[in-house]
A protein has these predicted regions:
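Transmembrane alpha-helical segments and their cytosolic interface motifs
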Residues: 488-532
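Short secondary-structure junctions and interdomain/linker hinges
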Residues: 52, 462, 466, 482, ...
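N-terminal leader/targeting and pre-domain segments
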Residues: 1-496
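A generic structural signal for secondary-structure junctions
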Residues: 28-29, 533, 599
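Hydrophobic alpha-helical transmembrane segments of multi-pass small-molecule transporters/permeases
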Residues: 454, 514, 577-580
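Helix-to-loop transition at the C-terminal end of transmembrane segments
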Residues: 530-540
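Pore domain of cation channels
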Residues: 523-525, 540-600
Length: 600
């Protein structure tokens, strides 16, 4: 009686098993199996006109398999029916170059052990590579996809989608262990790369996304290139991580972009890019240099963002720009232009934030900015009359040379006794200027005086006359120093007039100085009268004589002159006359200074 032959254990397969095996010739996972018998089974499938689809599910294609066995039954490598390679294992080199899949193509959980070639392939129906493993180099160069799924696919070697065209594609949770190249690819509909991971270099140069692209939660561990890419619709990078340098240079974003909570661990280069609509970078972290050189923004939101060594030079913000609560650790906005509201409320600064030659054409709020040893560079900055720098902001090392600071509202700003420009110039004259301070140091005292004048005008404009008076005092001090830059010149002699104003009345800002000098003058003349015996004093007590001298000095200084005590010699008359003139001057000076202060 002949031995009974069993059926293949693979689910849904009715073929006979091989001797000493549980599987048929198609599903037997042996590379030395009978290739001729295997080819005959392939040909049966290809010749079966009744079958709804080409069924290669779970097939094991040995290394010696030649895909011409399939193509000899097709016209121009065109699969007119659906084809199913689900869970198939390819030990042979896979050659679908130029193939056309008119219906559904299913490669879910397939394993490709060798090189895979889909160059120029056309997938006209649904295409599924979900969970597939590509252990060899995968070529999809020039391939066209209608609806493609690569969810959870693993690419162990290089994969090339250069010049590929996708109507809609999903790479969710895909894992790229080596280089992935999508250069010049076109995504006509939605493209999902959510939670994908790129272990090495990934290239999206000159890629075009016609609809939304989604890279949310994606991890880029290698160099990442989106240079010259065009995003016609919105793009999402929310919670993405860039472990190495990322290049978005010359990229065009035509709709809203979402970079919320993105982490850039290395340099991020967005220079010369265009953001046609809004851009959202809130809560993102740029842990190394962030380059936004010569970028064009519409609405830009960098709220709560951390920026280290960020470069926004020559950048244009066409609409509102929000940097509220951002953390700056060395940021340059030199030559940037803010056409609408710019908000830096509650941000914090370490190292430097530079607005050199920056233009603020609308509201600029630099309020309650935190930081101590930071440098704020507003040199040559063009402020609008809707600018406010204050609310507790520390201006210990702020620079305003050449700016329109007279338009700024500095309410509650924290100014030092001497502004940074003055301290730098003092250090220069004492030979103590540090190398990194040289570029910020003013040329002369006149430049510093101009800064004080503008700060004075700014505080006068907003009703803070006390602070305005302090800046006027420093302005006059710097003017005096400017006159003394060349010794024994005409200006040098003029500077002593400033010295008189300083020590007599504090340049008209210190009535207390006038009172102090008046008291000193009265006591000084009292001693002069006493020791020169130039007035008629009565009594033998030295104290009594001094009090009489002080009394006479006081009434002479105030030009009252009761006559009960009078000079008795020429020296006394000269002293009395001098004191009367000096008293008249100081009384008038006190009235002027006091009235000036009170009228404010």
């Amino acid at each position: 009686m002949p031995e009974k032959v069993g059926k293949c254990k693979y689910e849904g397969c009715n073929r006979k098993v091989l001797p000493n095996s549980k599987y048929c010739i198609c599903h037997e996972k042996r590379d030395d199996k009978d290739i001729e018998a295997f080819n005959r089974e392939i040909e049966k499938i290809m010749q079966d006109k009744e079958a709804e689809f080409y069924d290669f599910r779970g097939f094991y294609f040995p290394e010696s398999f030649d895909f011409e066995v399939i193509y000899r039954h097709l016209k121009d490598r065109t699969f007119e029916k659906s084809v199913n390679f689900e869970k198939a294992i390819f030990y042979s080199v896979v050659d679908f170059k130029g193939a056309i899949f008119q219906k559904k193509a299913d490669f879910n959980f397939a394993i490709f052990k060798r090189r895979i070639n889909f160059k120029g392939a056309n997938f006209e129906g649904e295409t599924h590579f979900d969970g597939a493993t590509f252990e060899g180099i995968a070529y999809f160069t020039g391939a066209e996809f209608q609806l493609a799924y690569f969810k959870g696919a693993i690419f162990s070697k290089k994969v090339k989608f250069i010049n590929a065209k996708f109507k809609r594609v999903n790479f969710e949770n895909a894992f790229f262990q080596k280089e992935a190249d999508f250069e010049v690819a076109i995504f006509k509909d939605e493209a999902f790369f959510t939670s994908a991971e790129f272990q090495e270099r990934v290239n999206f140069k000159q890629v075009r996304f016609y609809t939304e692209g989604n890279f949310g939660n994606t991890t880029f561990k290698g160099l990442t290139y989106f240079r010259d890419a065009i995003f016609e619709k919105g793009v999402i990078f929310r919670n993405a991580k860039f472990k190495e340098m990322s290049d978005f240079k010359y990229t065009i974003f035509k709709e809203w972009i979402d970079f919320v909570r993105v982490v850039f661990e290395k340099k991020a280069d967005f220079s010369f890019s265009e953001f046609k609509k809004g851009s959202d970078f809130r809560y993102s972290r740029f842990e190394e240099k962030a380059d936004f050189w010569d970028v064009e923004f519409q609405e830009a939101d960098f709220g709560y963002t951390t920026l280290r060594q960020a470069d926004f030079r020559y950048t244009r913000f066409r609409k509102e720009a929000n940097f509220g609560h951002a953390r700056f650790q060395g940021v340059e906005f030199d030559y940037a232009v803010f056409e609408k509201r710019a908000d830096f409320l509650n941000s914090s600064v370490t190292k430097i934030i530079s607005f050199y030659n920056t233009g603020f054409h609308d509201t600029f709020s630099f309020i309650d900015v935190k930081g101590k040893k930071h440098r704020l560079d507003f040199m040559d900055t063009e402020f609008s009359d809707r600018t406010r720098i204050g609310g507790g902001t520390n201006l210990e090392r702020a620079l305003f040379s050449g700016s329109t600071a007279e338009l700024v509202d500095f309410t509650d700003a924290k100014f030092p006794e001497k502004i940074y420009e003055e301290r730098l110039l003092e250090k220069k004259f004492h030979g103590q200027l540090e190398k990194d301070e040289e570029e910020y140091c003013p040329e002369n005292w006149q430049e510093v005086s101009t800064v004080y004048r503008k700060l004075k005008q700014a505080h006068q404009r907003h009703g803070d006359y006390i602070k305005a008076g302090e800046f006027f005092y420093r302005e006059m001090e710097c003017k005096k120093k400017a006159l003394r830059e060349k010794r024994f010149s005409r200006e040098w002699f003029r500077s002593f007039g400033y010295s008189f104003l300083k020590y007599s009345c504090g340049y008209g800002e210190k009535p207390g100085t006038v009172i102090r000098n008046s008291i000193l003058a009265v006591f000084g003349f009292a001693f002069a009268y006493l020791f020169s015996n130039s007035i008629n004093l009565s009594g033998n007590s030295a104290v009594r004589k001094f009090l009489q001298s002080l009394y006479f000095s006081t009434i002479t200084f105030t030009t009252l002159g009761y006559g009960d005590i009078h000079p008795i010699n020429d020296a006394g008359r000269v002293l009395a006359m001098s004191e009367a003139v000096l008293g008249a001057i100081f009384v008038a000076l006190f009235i002027f200074v006091f009235s000036r202060k009170m009228m404010r």
